[in-house]
């Protein structure tokens, strides 16, 4: 089975455009941390986050700032990572459905494997064979030769993989022994399935758990397996006997993470109950409560620089990662100060972590304001912020203020159609544009706060402007207004660059903004930074990936049509006027009420007046000498427009009237009457 780097699926599947509003450098984990890997040789810790970013940290406690670098290429949660090749290569698995191969020392992505069709949840590594396995919600397990993966190039970009079939449910955990002779998977099927990766042969199925199997470990020779489950138990299995040989009921809730010492005598466990225990596998009654975290435990990593392990790193659903000392833990059996009764809580061995890698805040709440341009967000520290979706930036930090009060404070009686969606899954703002509604929102340049060079007030399409800004650096979108002959002269003189028109002419987005082209189902096709779209490789991939609906706007400059709104215009019952024939009118949904008032004054009221006058005024028609602005003034002085018996503000547009006042099905109906003098 071949897994290719890229597949040109843009023409076959519905493609959306997303971007992330964020700082250029995101030093801190912004959400829970799903996976950890320790490189003891370089004193480095790798954290894989729900914010889609893999970060590298120094574990040297003398270093004031532990942050080293970020590894960014994924677009969704990174669920697992493994260090290979003595720490030179990192493999990552993500909910964006990809497996990525990284240069761990330099921090860049070398290749992307797109074989999985759904979230990739788990990896397993056979150190002696440099073999990695990946598995996920598509129920597939793929085997990868790491040396082959690291040799991939732009021209040599196809890799062959073996697959293990037979899983009936989504896979959440995976383990392979160091020798690469046994692989075990855990799933929502509640069983352990075992294969021989050398032949891809199914060996056995182990039953016993009553819920999802979330964590798996194998000993070196592949004869014993440890499993942790959402059913709250840890089980020790003999693969030779094909049965469970011990069950450890250590936790009050689900067990999500396991680590074991090299001798396979002590298991370290953590999970939903936030507690981390060390249990002696030979004597289940001996278990030590090491510490209690502030959130459910997602992953643990033993410091194996000495035997017994001196410390354990712990990641949780919060963004902070802690290191807890294990010194003195193996003296507990002699002292008798251990927990042999789960119903009798004991004091943790550690009350404070030995080292802390601080995390950042995660956005957990969002409200789109009525102008459909600005957002209010609230994060895990209860800080509220104000954002500009159009310019892809934070406008203001408001601090710890009342979120609902801020929403009320910023309410405006204005209606703009929805044209984007917001996702907070990574803890940052991800904005998605879809062909179905991206071009729904038109506003006037004045209302958007933009000035036109000629002083006019053109109508602007928010989605169109944003797409042009996101792809501003892509040469294919550039427009050169000069003719070819002049172009050649200016090219020689070095003036051409200054004459090329880029972007939308009104604003730019931050150049570091990540832009993501992905299928509507969630699969990522291509991710790049705004500023990189001018690169040769990036331009080529954009040509393959950008959907036609985006090309129409950014390259061909074909702006979408205005939205029309149908409505009826009738005299108000109080005017005593005869009801006219019910003609269905149509106008731009941005048309202001005052323009309808002018129409009423000029085309209806004046005509009525004309029919009631004699021809004694030299046949001069009322309004013939009036200027256009005079009509506008007179219309506001003499005419009222109503909807649902509510007098309308002349500054309102028709879409706002329909949304806030009409509030009914069917076409909008407006009534007019002359103001009483």
Swiss-Prot record:
Q: Where are the WD repeats?
A: 28-67, 73-112, 115-154, 166-205, 208-247, 250-289, 292-334, 358-397
**N6-acetyllysine modification sites?**
214, 578
In the record's own words, the domains note is: The WD repeats are required for the interaction with deubiquitinating enzymes USP1, USP12 and USP46.
Instruction: Output compositional bias ranges, type Low complexity.
Output: 609-620
Gene Ontology CC, one term:
lysosome
- Molecular function via GO: deubiquitinase activator activity; DNA binding; double-stranded DNA binding; single-stranded DNA binding; ubiquitin binding
Family, per the entry? Belongs to the WD repeat WDR48 family.
| Main localization (coarse) | nucleus
Is the keyword Transmembrane helix in the record?
A: no
What is the purpose of this protein? Regulator of deubiquitinating complexes, which acts as a strong activator of USP1, USP12 and USP46. Enhances the USP1-mediated deubiquitination of FANCD2; USP1 being almost inactive by itself. Activates deubiquitination by increasing the catalytic turnover without increasing the affinity of deubiquitinating enzymes for the substrate. Also activates deubiquitinating activity of complexes containing USP12. Docks at the distal end of the USP12 fingers domain and induces a cascade of structural changes leading to the activation of the enzyme.
Residues where Phosphothreonine occurs? 613
Task: Extract the SMART domains matched here.
Answer: WD40
The entry's protein name is WD repeat-containing protein 48
Oligomeric and partner information:
Interacts with USP46. Interacts with USP1. Interacts with USP12. Component of the USP12-WDR20-WDR48 deubiquitinating complex. Component of the USP12-DMWD-WDR48 deubiquitinating complex. Interacts with PHLPP1. Interacts with RAD51AP1; the interaction is direct and promotes formation of a trimeric complex with RAD51 via RAD51AP1. Interacts with ATAD5; the interaction regulates USP1-mediated PCNA deubiquitination. Interacts with RAD51; the interaction is enhanced under replication stress.
Quote the subcellular location field of this record: Nucleus; Cytoplasm; Lysosome; Late endosome
GO BP term (any one): positive regulation of double-strand break repair via homologous recombination
> Which residue positions does Phosphotyrosine occur at?
28
Q: Where is this region: Disordered?
A: 607-628
Could you tell me the keywords of this UniProt record?
Acetylation, Cytoplasm, DNA damage, DNA repair, DNA-binding, Endosome, Lysosome, Nucleus, Phosphoprotein, Repeat, Ubl conjugation pathway, WD repeat
